[in-house]
């Protein structure tokens, strides 16, 4: 139970955050919590910052510094940009690639990140559409970038989103770089004070999907050994189209998909959890596999960086 003095202090902090919030939706959400005097919920949202680690950021979509929202993402982008500029030095502008999946606000967060990086003088590549996480990792190497950001919460529940950071070579972030970026984020000013310049995908970013498929084709073309019937679900995520293209290029033409789970849907309406490792998540896939007498059944997670076979 907060004291009256603690409540007054918390209310002041919340109002300061609202004044700095670039998103009218989360600002109004916090105003409503103030009006309702929901101090427990506000204390939860304003106790510390959303923790940044080797997996980047991940949390529930909501207003406040301990949740995933535009204000938090803009400050995270500023911290990452400052880290990259320090790491690369003064000889050239760092390169940053940004990708996103089909979750709620993923494209918004990606565009905010690209805008912060561009305003800071980075050479910025924004991928043009929702794509799998492995495409982003590939793009970091393909475009010879110094870092990458993938906006995704992988197989988390639909109310979550996240922010994965990759370094040069397309490798996911490891220590001690995570602590250095975390410190840079903590030192960043409020979102309103961080410059942003809108950016649109250029031709090299647009061509990345094709380059990724070309690399897969070169690596796996001709690996099909006779007919193989495949059942596939992308689990409402972003892997469906590109995996289908890759399978066909590799010579696997007899592919059957779970129709109701093929198109990206940020609410994952047909599963209780979009994690293919969870019991029950693959029921529709296994039924399809039995119906078509498939030789193998493949379930992707929503950002298509893992699968169950």
What residue ranges belong to the model's regions?
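Rossmann-fold NAD(P)-dependent oxidoreductase module
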Residues: 83, 116, 139, 219, ...
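Non-catalytic terminal/interface segments that mediate subunit docking, oligomerization
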Residues: 52, 62, 67-85, 238, ...
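N-terminal glycine-rich phosphate/adenylate-binding segment common to multiple enzyme folds
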Residues: 21, 25-29, 33-34, 138-146, ...
């Amino acid at each position: 139970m907060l004291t009256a003095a603690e409540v007054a202090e918390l209310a002041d902090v919340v109002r300061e955050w609202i004044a700095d919030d670039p998103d009218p939706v989360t600002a109004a959400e916090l105003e409503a919590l103030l009006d309702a005097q929901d101090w427990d919920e506000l204390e939860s949202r304003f106790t510390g910052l959303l923790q940044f680690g080797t997996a980047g950021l991940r949390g529930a979509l909501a207003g406040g510094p301990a949740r995933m929202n535009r204000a938090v993402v803009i400050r995270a982008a500023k911290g990452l940009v400052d880290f990259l500029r320090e790491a690369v030095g003064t000889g050239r502008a760092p390169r940053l690639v940004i990708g996103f999946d089909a979750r709620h606000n993923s494209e918004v967060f990606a565009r905010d990140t690209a805008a912060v990086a561009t305003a800071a003088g980075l050479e910025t590549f924004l991928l043009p559409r929702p794509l799998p996480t492995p495409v982003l990792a590939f793009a970091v190497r393909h475009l010879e970038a110094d870092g990458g950001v993938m906006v995704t919460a992988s197989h988390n529940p639909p109310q979550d989103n996240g922010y994965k950071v990759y370094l040069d070579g397309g490798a996911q972030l490891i220590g001690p770089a995570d602590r250095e970026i975390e410190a840079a984020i903590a030192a960043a000013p409020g979102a309103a004070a961080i410059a942003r310049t809108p950016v649109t995908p250029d031709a090299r970013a647009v061509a990345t999907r094709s380059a990724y498929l070309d690399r897969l084709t070169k690596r796996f073309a001709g690996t099909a050994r006779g007919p193989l019937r495949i059942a596939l679900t992308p689990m409402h995520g972003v892997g469906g189209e590109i995996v289908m293209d890759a399978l066909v290029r590799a010579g696997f033409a007899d592919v059957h998909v779970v129709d109701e789970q093929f198109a990206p849907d940020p609410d994952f309406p047909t599963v209780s959890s979009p994690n293919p490792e969870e019991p029950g998540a693959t029921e529709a896939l296994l039924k399809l596999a039995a119906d078509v007498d498939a030789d193998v059944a493949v379930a992707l997670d929503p950002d298509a960086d893992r699968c169950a076979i």
